[in-house]
From Swiss-Prot:
Superkingdom field: Bacteria
Free-text function comment from the UniProt entry: Involved in the oxidation of myo-inositol (MI) to 2-keto-myo-inositol (2KMI or 2-inosose).
Matching PANTHER family: INOSITOL 2-DEHYDROGENASE, PTHR43593
Record keywords: NAD, Oxidoreductase
Protein known as: Inositol 2-dehydrogenase
Biological process, per Gene Ontology: inositol catabolic process
Coiled-coil boundaries: none
Family to which the UniProt record says this protein belongs: Belongs to the Gfo/Idh/MocA family.
Keyword Oxidoreductase annotated: yes
InterPro entries hit by this protein: Gfo-Idh-MocA_inositol_DH, Gfo/Idh/MocA-like_OxRdtase_C, Gfo/Idh/MocA-like_OxRdtase_N, MI/DCI_dehydrogenase, NAD(P)-bd_dom_sf
Molecular functions per Gene Ontology: inositol 2-dehydrogenase (NAD+) activity; nucleotide binding
Subunit and interaction comment: Homotetramer.
Biological source species: Pseudomonas savastanoi pv. phaseolicola (strain 1448A / Race 6) (Pseudomonas syringae pv. phaseolicola (strain 1448A / Race 6))
Length: 336
């Protein structure tokens, strides 16, 4: 029997999730939608021909008797409110990042979920579902390259919009690395420093770009992440793990190799959605399957909280230039 989903937020990512849950994935049916712009929500229902009911707001949708699980895809500052409401209603909830806009807000969600007595929250970190990252983690976990000593990573975007500010390199961009690298290493961060190289002429006047974020983990692994959001040439994600006896590198997306006009070339993707489109499908299918089976295994509220704590420290390091400690308490046994 199909899991009946309610989707809060019908912007770009909300529409994508409605489409995949209705047309691509198995075991789910979108029966309810809402958006701050109700006309937009109704338009999405018509265009996708899904027959879902449009609710006045997120709280009405969560309370609807036929909604069995909730997808929160709305504006970031609204996430905490809706996730807490879903937990209070006893309904599983998939929340796009951020889980909340502050670490304190994420902590409220963790506490509410623990009080409920069961896992109800999955956070929309999609990279652990990417085939390349999974293959990289398999090599690390096998011990084939020994213990990880260093990671060299990069997160490059061709360009960003006028509203993008320097701290968003952490909260909107690096946040994915903060989650996936912690997952890759099964290790928590203990400190961070951020430095700014020479500024690119392609960056807007109000922002600093690129940035280099240097992290240290509890076991002493050193990580450097280049964040360059005006690189011009494409959307490019890199991750190289230097171990005691070898090096493992995140594979490039599969592209046709072209021999033409005296050149050997491979195309570089320009859009993050194209780079991780398959991971989005696997991620949401995992949520649907988990809810239908009675157990959610995906990125947890604690993972969302850990990423938020690290992000807060990174922003502090941006502003100070100093090495900033990252203080994360021990993970509750509830999330083991």
């Amino acid at each position: 029997m199909a899991l009946k989903l309610g989707v809060i937020g019908t912007g770009a990512i909300g529409q994508d999730h409605i489409r995949r849950c209705s047309k691509t994935l198995v075991g789910s049916q979108v029966v309810a939608v809402t958006d701050i712009n109700l006309e937009q929500a109704a338009k999405v229902v018509r265009e996708l021909d899904i027959g879902a009911e449009v609710y006045a707001d997120g709280h009405a949708l969560i309370a609807a008797p036929d909604v069995e699980a909730v997808l929160v895809c709305s504006w970031g500052p609204s996430h905490e409110e809706y996730v807490l409401a879903a937990i209070a209603a006893g309904k599983p909830v998939f929340c796009e990042k951020p889980l909340a806009v502050t670490a304190e807000g994420c902590r409220h969600i963790v506490e509410a979920e623990i009080a409920s007595g069961r896992r109800l929250v999955q956070v929309g970190f999609m990279r652990p579902y990417d085939q390349g990252y999974r293959a990289l983690k398999s090599v690390i976990d096998s011990g084939r390259i020994g213990e990880p000593l260093m990671l060299h990573c990069a997160h490059r975007n061709p360009r960003v919009g006028e509203n993008y500010k320097t701290d968003m390199a952490i909260t909107d961009t690096l946040i994915h690395e903060l989650n996936v690298l912690r997952w890759l290493l099964n290790d928590d961060y203990v400190s961070v420093q951020v430095v700014f190289p020479r500024k690119t002429s392609k960056a807007l006047a109000h922002m600093k770009d690129p940035q280099i974020v240097m992290l240290e983990t509890a076991r002493g692994t050193r990580i450097d992440v280049e964040v360059f959001v005006n690189c011009q040439y494409g959307y490019d994600i890199q991750c190289e793990v230097v171990g005691e006896s070898g090096i493992a590198k995140l594979p490039e997306p599969s592209q046709v190799q072209l021999r033409s006009e005296a050149k050997l070339s491979n195309a570089i993707l320009m859009d993050w959605k194209d780079r991780f489109i398959a991971a989005y499908d696997v991620e949401l299918q995992d949520f649907i399957d988990g809810v239908n089976a009675g157990t959610i295994y995906g990125p947890s509220a604690w993972d969302g909280y850990a990423a938020a704590v690290a992000a807060d420290a990174c922003v502090q390091a941006q502003n100070s230039g100093a090495v900033v400690p990252i203080a994360l308490e021990m993970r509750p046994a509830f999330y083991d």
